[in-house]
Structures are given as structure tokens and as C-alpha cells.
């Protein structure tokens, strides 16, 4: 299927690209509600309030840390390098970039927060709230931005030819690795296994609300439209819009 050749002004492309970043970012941010509901529905009733607090807190921490150091750690990296600069993000938008810097920061920040949301689900009922927040600051401010910059920021993985679309490795690989490390260090939920290694009855660990967890799954499904569609990073041409669709 071909497209008639069209000419779109830089200003129009700037507007549509920025709108794509913002609208997709809103959908990805809505996934935070999905994670919170899914986790809250699957943990025991006594842990629901802690799960909600952790999900609200990790997003707040991610926003602050990604503004303070995260964005420039990822995008301030020299070509083929390993780490950017420890400086706060500042908006320096121009039409030449093809999109608003602020919309790009927001879109990348919600990806960063999603990485920590992956960890939250694994560590549910395994970790206290303040150590969790401390790790959230480290992951969203340092670990994820550095690994993100290796490819999306033009770092050594990018120059080596590695490609990542929609964070299949950078988001889910980083989040999964951090979650696995946390699970290994912290161990199983207290009281889940007997001294001989056998699994105890699930009665004390019954899910608090399966309908709530189900609603969380549907919200996450909806959020993926922003996560994957927005990763086209452009909506200023027919080809770009077709790719988003």
C-alpha cells in the first residue's frame, strides 16, 4: 500500500508529534492504576493499603528523580558512551527537534515509572515501605536511565547495532532483572513455606479481591495502546500515523 507524497510543515509535525507523546504518556500513566489494582487485588487484605501507598509513592519518586538526574543521564550521554550527566532536565524546545522537549520528558518519565511498577508487583508483601522507596529512587534516578541511555540515548548498545522498540528490553529487562534480584535477596513472603520447604495452605494468603485484580488487568491492556503506539515517536506523516495504528 503506497501513499501519495505529501508535504507537511515543520510546525504541523511538531504539533502532532507532541500530541502523540502527551496522549500516549497519559495512557501509560493510567497503567499505574492498573498495576495498583492488580497488586491490591492479589495480595492479602491487610497489605492493600501498603500496596496503594507504594504505587503512589513510586510514581512521585520517579517523576522527581527523572527530572533531577534521570533524563540527562540517559540523553546527555556521548555517542557510543556509557553514562550521561548528573544534571537536572530543562526545557529547551525548538521546532527543529520535531516535538516539545517537555512532552518527550513526560513520555520517557512514565516509562521510567513503569519499570519500577514491575518491581513493585514482585516485591509485594516482601519489603517494608521505606526501603522500597529508597530502591525506587535508585532505580528510577540512576539504574534505569543509564541502561536506557545505552540504546535510546545513543550509547554503546546503539552504536553496536542493538535496537529496542517500546522498551521490550530497556523497560521490561531492567524491571525484571531488578525484581528478580529483589526476590532473591528478600526471599519468599513470610510464612509462605514451611521449614521443610513445603508450601503452606493458601488460606492466609487468599487474594483480597479478584474482581479488582481483573479490572487492573483491563486497565493495563488499555495502557499498552499508549505504550506501544507512542513508541513510534512521530505522528506527523501518513506513514507514521499508519505505524501507530
Regions inferred by a protein language model and the residue ranges of each:
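Hydrophobic alpha-helical transmembrane bundles of multi-pass membrane proteins
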Residues: 1-245
Amino acid at each position: 500500500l503506497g501513499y501519495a507524497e505529501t508535504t507537511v510543515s515543520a510546525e504541523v509535525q511538531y504539533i502532532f508529534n507532541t500530541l502523540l507523546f502527551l496522549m500516549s504518556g497519559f495512557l501509560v500513566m493510567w497503567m499505574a492504576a492498573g498495576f495498583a489494582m492488580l497488586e491490591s487485588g492479589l495480595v492479602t487484605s491487610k497489605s492493600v493499603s501498603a500496596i496503594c501507598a507504594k504505587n503512589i509513592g513510586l510514581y512521585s519518586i520517579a517523576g522527581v528523580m527523572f527530572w533531577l538526574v534521570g533524563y540527562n543521564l540517559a540523553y546527555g550521554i556521548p555517542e557510543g558512551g556509557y553514562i550521561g550527566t548528573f544534571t537536572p532536565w530543562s526545557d529547551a524546545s525548538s521546532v527543529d527537534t520535531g516535538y516539545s522537549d517537555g512532552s518527550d520528558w513526560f513520555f520517557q518519565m512514565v516509562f521510567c515509572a513503569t519499570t519500577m511498577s514491575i518491581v513493585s508487583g514482585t516485591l509485594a508483601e516482601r519489603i517494608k515501605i521505606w526501603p522500597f522507596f529508597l530502591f525506587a529512587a535508585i532505580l528510577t534516578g540512576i539504574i534505569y536511565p543509564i541502561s536506557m541511555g545505552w540504546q535510546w540515548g545513543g550509547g554503546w548498545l546503539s552504536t553496536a547495532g542493538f535496537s529496542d522498540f517500546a522498551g521490550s528490553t530497556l523497560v521490561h529487562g531492567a524491571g525484571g532483572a531488578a525484581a528478580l534480584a529483589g526476590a532473591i535477596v528478600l526471599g519468599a513472603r513470610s510464612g509462605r513455606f514451611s521449614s521443610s520447604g513445603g508450601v503452606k495452605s493458601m488460606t492466609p494468603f487468599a487474594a483480597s479481591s479478584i474482581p479488582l485484580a481483573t479490572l487492573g488487568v483491563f486497565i493495563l491492556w488499555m495502557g499498552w495502546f499508549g505504550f506501544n503506539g507512542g513508541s513510534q515517536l512521530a505522528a506527523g506523516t501518513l506513514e507514521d500515523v499508519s505505524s501507530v495504528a
